[in-house]
């Protein structure tokens, strides 16, 4: 998801999206620990997406 798509959302939508992405990050980290994750780069991409969402939330305040 690009930043332009993220900044169009409301703060409530962003908070819900942030919570969803953090849960997904947690599950990906667990899969990495148990050697079930085929592509570890997914974690890096997800962290960047979480950072974009946090930036959009901070910018809207």
Curated annotation (Swiss-Prot):
Q: Which UniProt keywords apply?
A: Ribonucleoprotein, Ribosomal protein
Q: Which PROSITE patterns match?
A: RIBOSOMAL_L29 (PS00579)
KW Ribosomal protein (keyword) present: yes
GO CC terms, sorted: ribonucleoprotein complex; ribosome
The family database entries (InterPro entries) matched by this protein are listed as:
Ribosomal_uL29, Ribosomal_uL29_CS, Ribosomal_uL29_sf
Q: Does the keyword ATP-binding apply?
A: no
Q: Which domain of life is it from?
A: Bacteria
Molecular function GO terms recorded: structural constituent of ribosome
Q: Name one GO biological process term.
A: translation
Q: Where is the signal peptide?
A: none
Q: Which family does it belong to?
A: Belongs to the universal ribosomal protein uL29 family.
Q: What is this protein called?
A: Large ribosomal subunit protein uL29
Q: Give the originating organism.
A: Campylobacter curvus (strain 525.92)
């Amino acid at each position: 998801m690009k930043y332009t798509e993220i900044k169009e959302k409301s703060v409530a939508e962003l908070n819900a999206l942030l919570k969803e992405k953090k849960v997904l990050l947690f599950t990906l980290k667990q899969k990495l620990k148990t050697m079930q994750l085929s592509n570890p780069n997914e974690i890096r991409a997800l962290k960047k997406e979480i950072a974009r969402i946090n930036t959009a939330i901070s910018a809207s305040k």
